[in-house]
Amino acid sequence: MRASRVADHADAIIDALEPSAVLARRRAAPGDDLPLGSSRLGGTPDLPRAIQWPVQRFTERVGLFKKRDVVREGPLDFLAQIRCEDVPKGSVPGAFPDHGILYAFYDAVRAPWDVAACDGREALLLHCVDVDDLVRATPPDPDRPSFAPCPVDVALGWTLPTDDLPVPDADDEACEAYYEELLPVIQGPENDPSHRLFGEARWIQSDALEDRPSERLLLQIDSDSGQDGPGWMWGDAGTLYFLIRDADLGAGRFSLARLVLQCY
């Protein structure tokens, strides 16, 4: 890089690199015979025996002429389970737990765009430390979306800001062009699904962290509807971003993370 046409700005670009834990999914597994407790996208979760599949309560407006609010219940849809021991050291902040399993659920039917807290009402982030007695859960509603189980390899990766060139006073067109070429080399082609823990988010619309300096990306789950993937699509080729405050991360309060959906 230092010998390239952005040599004068190489140090600034290097300083802008953020480590990330890449969730590199493999081909969807037949059935759901992945090892109990293994990291995966889609399929069904392996929950501690004492934990039930999360069910949300929500209010729905019904009636053709005389509208009324009806409280309904329905299960959340399983997205991912990440075995914390699989996450490489140095790819995530030190406050991220090194034991247990992090689970992610979301209402894939109603697909809310903005969830204030992932506490089980529209989405859920759940970290379980005691995972010695796991059982493969049974989906409570066969009519809900079913996503193919994909084993996940968790690897150290790197990210760069996608919106702004991290170089002061760099209005050089050559530098900008090189940076655009560099981004997919560092963090993968733009059109490939990007699932990851931490690092710089690959925003589709505006930066949801721009006015929230105390927050960071926790988990990014991309649309992945190819035949080898879990088969989900968020809006028009969108992405789910789970965002968490540093204080909540340090205290393990994952249910206080918020969720943003962006799409094209």
Residue map of PLM features:
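Preference for intrinsically disordered or flexible, low-complexity segments
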Residues: M1-Y264
